[in-house]
From Swiss-Prot:
Transmembrane stretches, start-end: 9-29, 478-498, 511-531, 534-554, 575-595, 598-618, 620-640, 646-666, 683-703, 717-737, 746-768, 814-834, 857-877, 886-906, 924-944
Protein name from the UniProt record: GPI ethanolamine phosphate transferase 1
GO annotation terms (biological process): cell wall organization; GPI anchor biosynthetic process
Enzyme Commission number, as recorded: 2.-.-.-
Enzyme class label: transferase
A GO CC term attached to the entry: endoplasmic reticulum membrane
Family, similarity comment: Belongs to the PIGG/PIGN/PIGO family. PIGN subfamily.
Domain of life, per lineage: Eukaryota
Keywords: Cell wall biogenesis/degradation, Endoplasmic reticulum, Glycoprotein, GPI-anchor biosynthesis, Membrane, Transferase, Transmembrane, Transmembrane helix
Length: 971
């Protein structure tokens, strides 16, 4: 491999991996600090113990609203007991979670009061215990029951007091999506009952259970499992909620009877919700709205709206429109007559700490929700003040950390205007007044002190954000220079690899002492600055790339200028302008398409017209132009369909029939025009024969799973056999008996992936696969007709020693269209705006037991298949244009980061969690597109190894005209 190509690959991979992570280092750095003193929530705890009950994946609306049961048709409340607690015994509201709406971040927020950065979902669960303080760690002892994915992460770790947290959990084999999810929750209730029963015969255990400050954590995974498997509107999901409600109605009185002192507090909530699609992770309201009900010792009883003094203000506060809900969201809840107390999920940790008098978790940023507390004004004020001091403690530690590593530190201006000490003096003075005041003025003073404490908390949290983003300007400038540097640097390598001739490259760049001195001084200065700021290793890499890129660019500017002249040789200024407009238009259109998929439809229509507009359009027949335009119109259908798909056996069967028809017709055409050996014929017939077999297995699996009878073993085995044979065994046999015809090779690749798509599709994905294959095949044919003929290339080369004028224009066009198809391969069936657009329904046909890595691998295979088709197409394009391997992909790589740069500046840290999540996902997908191009044509070089092109009888590893031009002597 050429040294420049090796350099491009190595540096390209490193650059994109490091810069992929840059948004997390800049925008989403965890505010985690260590070394704070603890602050006790209250010296007069109202409860001796607390039960935290978490319904994993439980939506707020399904918990409270009246619903029609899908199995019985009865209109009912699914959780009448929990509703009765909200109506008669405690306080209720909506707990608003943050993105990512996954189990680990959700539990960390409610138990530690801390929002992990977005990268938390990459840390796993059991294998990565939380590395910060938690409410459990501040309890006397915690007894936890439930899932092996959740319990261990709080029970182990450097900061956990050994032996403080007990875990009782089932094995992973219990998490079977085709079995009853109720069994998971039954396990929890059974073992809680067993624990209390054992204490009657074990005096030591009995004494331990009755200690003040104990916590009992019941993690109920059933709703999440049922929601994933059957959707949150299914009978299974509803029945799981009903089961939890019935068991709580039994268990709560038993708990009160067991302890016999009415000193138990209860909190019922969820870690996240569940989308209608049966997934979670993004910021959709169905995922972020969870129920919260608290009752028992220390919790305020329900307050009727008619009893509040500021009725108008309260009505305005909890009206759907003013509190961020749809106008009809609460319509059937029949809780409108009660005060609703909504909280942020991290506030739950502060509430629980107060109820049993524990220290606030050291890293908690939650605010004690006073609406849930039944206490006198002074107690509430002191508890909230202690809460604020715990947050102030974090600010002091973080400020010192930043101050120690800055040449010149600029303090947070609001605390310059009014110091924390001043806030403390005012608050303590107001609390003293509150203690001494009479009943007449107490309410007014209480409002003042609470407002002052909340002001301190908000200012402190804003101050923490200020400290977190202290070096934003420097880092964003470095990363921006890095992106622009990479774009120019990689384009320069493209020119050296594919455009400049060898004699031009033999003249080395002149050594410039000035240039070395300038960049040497810059490197020393930036590295010293980063060292002084105690920056992590990643920061040094962010700075190293732009320094290297821009030094190389300026040092090799002669290559860049000469190469651009050769690349644009013979292209008019008007055409150059149109090229720039096309590049900008395509990349900006794609960027907009990340938010509105309809833009991909508009671009497809424009691409459908391009054979009419380009030079040489007369070479393409009217019939081919018409078929091409119709195909582009049909492909628009997929980018307008809802990416959140519902399983449809009808669409699966229709897609399979279409794939079978295309397979048979394609086979007949290839057999007619190509001499195919007997072994290859048998293998292709076997590939086609597998299609109805795997369709049969898929139908059996889908019908059984939809009927809730589980996954039949024989259909699972048949599915795996056909999956492995079609994807692994038959391709290997083809490899052992290779064909040199490129159309036959394309047919084999198409047939290889049809069975995989059948068993892993839930809706229209197979139809998209067939359409995408056909549009790529037509694109190949059109570009073959539009290219310079081999004869013209040879004649021009022999006369001038150069390529024809405008030769690279077709490469530019293919690059623009190819990058669009790279995005279409994903957006044709998916939408990055919703993590929930990836369904697990299909993988249940092969893996019914919860196994995130295996399930994720199957989904990745399904996502990668269209890219393999595209890589094969680009590989053949290189040959058709008689250019070297990797020419097209290298040009795409050098320009595609304009899209990444777009999304780097569109990353959001404020607004809805859906918007924040989308901005992160967009950036990651854009930068991975560039990285993925490095892999695509490597794949094509493997799958097209030894293929011959019939028009000139040469192989794909022939020496193309463009390469002979590069080797000519400079005259």
């Amino acid at each position: 491999m050429d040294r420049n190509r090796q350099l491009l690959l190595v540096i390209g991979v490193l650059f994109h991996f490091f810069y992929l992570w840059s948004i997390f280092d800049i925008y989403f750095v965890s505010p985690l600090v260590h070394g704070m003193d603890h602050h006790k929530s209250t010296w007069t705890p109202p409860a001796k113990r607390l039960f935290l009950i978490v319904g994993d994946g439980l939506r707020a609306d399904k918990t409270f609203q009246k619903l029609t049961h899908p199995r019985t048709g009865e209109e009912k409340y699914l959780a009448p007991y929990l509703r009765s607690l909200a109506l008669n015994n405690g306080t209720w509201g909506i707990s608003n979670t943050r993105m990512p709406t996954e189990s680990r971040p959700g539990h960390v927020a409610m138990i530690a009061g801390f929002y992990e950065d977005v990268s938390a979902v990459t840390k796993g669960w059991k294998e990565n215990p939380v590395d910060f303080d938690s409410f459990f760690n501040q309890s006397k002892h915690t007894y936890s029951f439930g899932s092996p994915d959740i319990l261990p992460m709080f029970a182990f770790g450097d900061g956990v007091v050994p032996g403080r947290i007990d875990v009782c959990m089932y094995g992973h084999e219990f998490e079977d999506f085709t079995a009853s999810s109720i069994e998971l929750d039954a396990y929890v209730f059974h073992h809680l009952d067993e624990l209390m029963h054992n204490s009657t015969t074990n005096a030591t255990l009995n004494e331990e259970l009755r200690q003040d400050g104990n916590v009992f954590f019941l993690h109920l995974l059933g709703p999440d499992t049922a929601g994933h498997a059957y959707r949150p509107y299914s009978a299974e999901y509803y029945e799981n909620i009903e089961y939890i409600d019935r068991k709580l109605e039994e268990v709560i009185p038993q708990i009160n009877k067991f302890f016999g002192d009415d000193q138990t507090a209860f909190v019922f909530t969820a870690d996240h919700g569940m989308s209608d699609f049966g997934s979670h992770g993004d910021g959709h309201p169905d995922n972020t709205r969870t129920p919260l009900i608290a009752w028992g010792a220390g919790v305020k009883k329900p307050i009727h709206l008619q009893d509040v003094s500021n009725l108008e203000e309260q009505l305005l506060k909890q009206s759907p429109e003013n509190s961020g809900f749809e106008s009809t969201y609460f319509d059937t809840w029949e809780l409108d007559h009660l005060v609703r107390n909504d909280v942020n999920q991290a506030d739950i940790a502060s509430l629980m700490a107060y109820l049993i008098g524990a220290n606030y978790p050291a890293n908690s940023v939650g605010e004690l929700p006073l609406g849930y507390i039944d206490a006198d004004p002074v107690t509430k004020a002191r508890a909230l003040y202690a809460n604020s001091l715990a947050i102030v403690e974090q600010y002091f530690v973080k400020e010192q950390e930043v101050y120690n590593h800055q040449f010149k530190f600029k303090p947070y201006s609001p605390f310059e205007e009014k110091s924390i000490q001043k806030y403390q003096q005012e608050i303590e003075s107001l609390i003293d007044q509150l203690e001494k005041s009479g009943s007449g003025s107490k309410d007014e003073i209480e409002k003042k002190v609470i407002a002052k404490i909340e002001e301190l908390m908000k200012t402190t949290l804003d101050g923490l954000t200020y400290l977190q983003t202290y070096n934003w300007l420097l880092l964003r400038s470095i990363v921006t220079l890095g992106f622009f540097g990479w774009i120019v640097y990689s384009f320069n390598i493209f020119l050296k690899l594919f455009v400049l001739n060898e004699d031009e490259l033999k003249i080395p760049p002149e050594f410039s002492v000035t240039l070395v001195g300038i960049f040497g001084a810059l490197a020393i200065s930036i590295n010293y600055l980063l060292f002084y700021q105690n920056s992590p290793f990643n920061y040094y890499m962010y700075a190293a790339f732009p320094l290297y890129f821009w030094y190389t660019i300026l040092n090799e500017k002669k290559y860049l200028i000469t190469g651009i002249e050769s690349f644009l040789h013979g292209i008019s200024n008007t055409t150059k302008f149109l090229i720039v407009v096309s590049f900008i238009g395509m990349y900006e259109g794609i960027a907009y398409g990340f938010f509105e998929r309809v833009m991909f439809s508009i671009i497809l229509i424009i691409i459908g017209l391009y054979p009419l507009l380009v030079h040489g359009a007369h070479k393409v027949s009217g019939l081919m132009k018409t078929i091409w335009f119709i195909t582009c119109l049909l492909m628009c259908t997929f980018t307008n369909l809802d990416p959140v798909k519902i399983e449809s056996l009808f669409q699966i069967n229709v897609g399979t029939i279409l794939a079978l028809i295309v397979s048979i017709m394609g086979t007949k055409q290839v057999f007619k025009r190509t001499q195919v050996g007997p072994i290859q014929k048998q293998l292709i017939i076997a590939q086609i024969a597998i299609i109805p077999i795997i369709l049969f297995a898929t139908n059996i699996s889908v019908l059984s799973l939809q009927a809730r009878t589980g996954l039949p073993l024989y259909s699972q085995i048949l599915g795996w056999i056909t999956f492995i044979v079609s994807l692994i065994v038959l391709p290997i046999l083809h490899f052992l008996n290779p064909s040199s015809d490129y159309q036959l090779r394309l047919l084999i690749i198409f047939l290889t992936f049809v069975p995989t798509f059948i068993i892993l599709t839930i809706s229209f994905e197979l139809l998209f696969y067939v359409g995408f294959s056909l549009i790529l095949l037509q694109w190949l044919s059109i570009e073959e007709l539009l290219k310079f003929s081999h004869k013209d290339l040879v004649e021009t080369f022999e006369k001038t020693g150069k390529l024809p004028k405008g030769y690279w224009l077709q490469v530019i066009r293919i690059t623009i269209i190819g990058f669009f198809f790279l995005q279409l391969a994903f957006f044709g069936t998916g939408n990055i705006a919703s993590i929930s657009s990836f369904s697990l329904d299909s993988v249940y046909r092969l893996i019914p037991i919860f196994d995130p890595f295996s399930m994720g691998a199957l989904l990745m295979i399904k996502l990668i298949i269209p890219y393999v088709l595209l890589s094969t197409c680009l590989g053949i394009m290189n040959h058709q244009l008689e250019i070297k391997k990797f020419t097209i992909s290298t040009l795409i790589i050098s320009t595609s980061d304009f899209l990444s740069l777009n999304f780097f500046f569109l990353v959001r840290t404020e607004g809805s969690w859906l918007d924040i999540g989308v901005s992160i996902s967009n950036y990651c997908l854009a930068i991975l597109s560039s990285l993925f191009m490095l892999i695509l044509e490597l794949i094509s070089s493997v799958v097209l190894s030894g293929v011959e092109y019939n028009s000139d009888g040469t192989k794909l590893d022939f020496e193309p005209i463009s390469y002979r031009v590069r080797k000519r002597k400079v005259t």
